[in-house]
Amino acid sequence: MANTLSFDQISTVLNDIVKQATGVETMKATDTSSFVAQAQTALLVGNDRIMNSISQVLDRTIFSVRPYNAKFKGLRRTTQQWGNHVRKLGMLDDDWENDQRQPLDDDTAVDMYKIKKGKVLQTNFYGGQVFQRHRTYFRDQLDQAFRNPDEFGQFISMYTQNTMDMIEQAHESMARACVANYIGAKNIWQASVTASTVGYTGEHVVKLLTMYNTENGTKLTAEDVRKAENFPSFYKWACAKIMTYMDFFTERTTRFHANITGKEIARHTPLQMQNIMIFSPDLHTADTTVLSNTFHDQYLKIATNEKVNFWQTLESPMNINVTPSVMTPDGSVEKGEAQVMSNIFAVLFDEEAMGLTTINQWSSTTPFNSAGGYWNIYYHFTDRYWNDLTENGLVFVLE
């Protein structure tokens, strides 16, 4: 599992996450603590004996593939090639002292050699997740399926590009799960603060709809607020509220992150180090119903780092259902309670609050198999997907 010194096999959960992201499976509880012609498959001629999906040549072949670029690029961080332990150091504030210049009495001395060691907070990130993929390349068994070497070359290009696309989507899907884990962990902290659980402090989840209804004397639900007569005014208000929090992040405070008991640390996040992810359908609605009707467009154009089409699955795009890893007030990490959340609108966070580090990646080709007439190419990855709850971050929900 994560948060140990080992590098864990992640293929099972990776397959699960990718299937949910691509719609192969519907949303289910995911343990992120561990992370007009219709096409048809019916084939009316003989198949190649090796691949069993390539028709023997008839007239022409369309090679259906295009490069895929992974989303959540904003989570990529510096590559760490050596070791499996990364530490992060931060300074804690000291109390101010009385000025020793006064009073000064006769027969007394001022000690200027008093020792005062600074207080340091060290947080640690351990381990990583390992996974692999491999593909087989045949020497001549596919010759009967193509008309000439050029067409065979196009097939190999498509074949290889498909491998690259799957690798890109694997990183994207795990990065999406990293965000979902962060949202779930922040929700655990907010629930514990609300319940006055000892050691839990700060503000972690902002209920935009509750605040809006309180300030405006309305009783709108998440469904009501998206109606044409309500959405423009709500979105303008929500943008102003989020930008206010963005300004708050620039203040040096202990308010917007988790603190370790006895080692409270003041954080500030300059605007250029703030990232925001916003649910894209609401952003597109705003583009057509709100932004075009304002005199000062820049007022509502938040510098969005990433538009998010869905947080976990396309089937339920605004929802998550995860069992996150979470840091507790004593600084340890535990597997939290399952978090089922809906109506997630946006996530605002310090660039060091979460991310993806590819520790190592490489590929290698096997020797040619003379008996079988093929060779394999293996792709290996060691990734670390991480959250740091001691950095500033807020989750905005339509509740």
Describe each region flagged by the PLM.
Residues 1-68, 284-399:
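Extended, compositionally biased alpha-helical segments that mediate assembly or anchoring
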Residues 5-12, 41-45, 49, 53, ...:
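Alpha-helix boundary/N-cap detector
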Residues 29-31, 68-75, 172, 186, ...:
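Short glycine-rich, low-complexity/disordered patches
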Residues 51-135:
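Assembly/oligomerization interface modules of large self-assembling protein complexes
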Residues 53, 57, 158, 208-211:
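Charge-rich, solvent-exposed alpha-helical interaction surfaces
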Residues 137, 206-208, 396:
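Generic detection of short hydrophobic beta-strand segments and adjacent strand-loop junctions
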Residues 188-322:
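Extended, solvent-exposed, turn-rich assembly/linker loops in the middle of proteins
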